[in-house]
């Protein structure tokens, strides 16, 4: 029963059949799209998902370091450390990474959306974006809680600096606007500088 969710997922993923010189070859739809340099970041941002995204980015760089990569994002956010692993890899690799929000890009999802190549960050018309300050929770001795409180304040400051860099907004504006959940439409995200354009068609 341990593998039941994975089996159900695999059963629901469409397969694509291609004719090759050696006969038919079948791919799951995500592997086929990876051949077109399309990566999907869907769901909660956590360590396992981050490792898969990082691996795909590195693989596509090895395949062609000069051709852009398309990262489609539909995420409510998640772990800061997992998200930073993806973000740092996006900045590290040679290919330009175009980000596209489909559905929603919230919290760390919004941060990764903004971290795409300048001029290549997009939303579809009815998607939404949300920015806020990082969340944290810790139990333990008072001195350890104080240490973790300082750490999350440091993370908050770093993320605000990076959002300021990617959006062009002053730090004081970012600090004010991330104090609470701040939802934006696709058009508002363009005005804010989180993305560069709203895509309505190819």
UniProtKB/Swiss-Prot annotation:
Active site (catalytic residues): 107, 132
PROSITE patterns registered for this protein in UniProt: CLP_PROTEASE_HIS, CLP_PROTEASE_SER
Function per UniProt: Cleaves peptides in various proteins in a process that requires ATP hydrolysis. Has a chymotrypsin-like activity. Plays a major role in the degradation of misfolded proteins.
Swiss-Prot/TrEMBL keywords: Cytoplasm, Hydrolase, Protease, Serine protease
Catalytic activities: Hydrolysis of proteins to small peptides in the presence of ATP and magnesium. alpha-casein is the usual test substrate. In the absence of ATP, only oligopeptides shorter than five residues are hydrolyzed (such as succinyl-Leu-Tyr-|-NHMec, and Leu-Tyr-Leu-|-Tyr-Trp, in which cleavage of the -Tyr-|-Leu- and -Tyr-|-Trp bonds also occurs)
Keyword Cytoplasm: yes
Family under the similarity heading: Belongs to the peptidase S14 family.
Tagged with keyword Cytoplasm: yes
Domain of life: Bacteria
Assembly notes: Fourteen ClpP subunits assemble into 2 heptameric rings which stack back to back to give a disk-like structure with a central cavity, resembling the structure of eukaryotic proteasomes.
Gene Ontology CC: cytoplasm; endopeptidase Clp complex
Taxonomic lineage of the native organism: Bacteria, Pseudomonadati, Pseudomonadota, Gammaproteobacteria, Alteromonadales
Organism annotation: Shewanella amazonensis (strain ATCC BAA-1098 / SB2B)
Annotated compartments: Cytoplasm
GO-annotated biological processes: protein quality control for misfolded or incompletely synthesized proteins
One Pfam family per UniProt: CLP_protease
NCBIfam families xref list: clpP, PRK00277.1, PRK12553.1
Name listed for the protein in its UniProt record: ATP-dependent Clp protease proteolytic subunit
This enzyme's EC code(s): 3.4.21.92
Gene Ontology molecular functions: ATP-dependent peptidase activity; ATPase binding; serine-type endopeptidase activity
């Amino acid at each position: 029963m341990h593998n039941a969710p994975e089996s159900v997922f695999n059963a629901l993923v469409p397969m694509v059949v291609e004719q090759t010189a050696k006969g038919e070859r079948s791919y799951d739809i995500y592997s086929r799209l990876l051949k077109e340099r399309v990566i999907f970041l869907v769901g909660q941002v956590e360590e396992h998902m981050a490792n898969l995204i990082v691996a795909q980015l590195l693989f596509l760089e090895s395949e062609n370091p000069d051709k852009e990569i398309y990262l489609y994002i539909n995420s409510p956010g998640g772990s800061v450390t997992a998200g930073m692993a993806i973000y740092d890899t996006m900045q590290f690799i040679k290919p330009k990474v175009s980000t596209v929000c489909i559905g929603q890009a919230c919290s760390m999802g919004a941060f990764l959306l903004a971290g795409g190549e300048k001029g290549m960050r997009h939303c579809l018309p009815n998607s939404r974006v949300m920015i806020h300050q990082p969340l944290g929770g810790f139990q333990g001795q008072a001195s350890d809680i104080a240490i973790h409180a300082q750490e999350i304040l440091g993370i908050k400051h770093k993320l605000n600096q990076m959002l300021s860099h990617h959006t062009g907004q002053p730090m004081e504006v970012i600090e004010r606007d991330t104090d609470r959940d701040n939802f934006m439409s696709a058009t508002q995200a363009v005005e804010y500088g989180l993305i560069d354009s709203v895509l309505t068609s190819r």
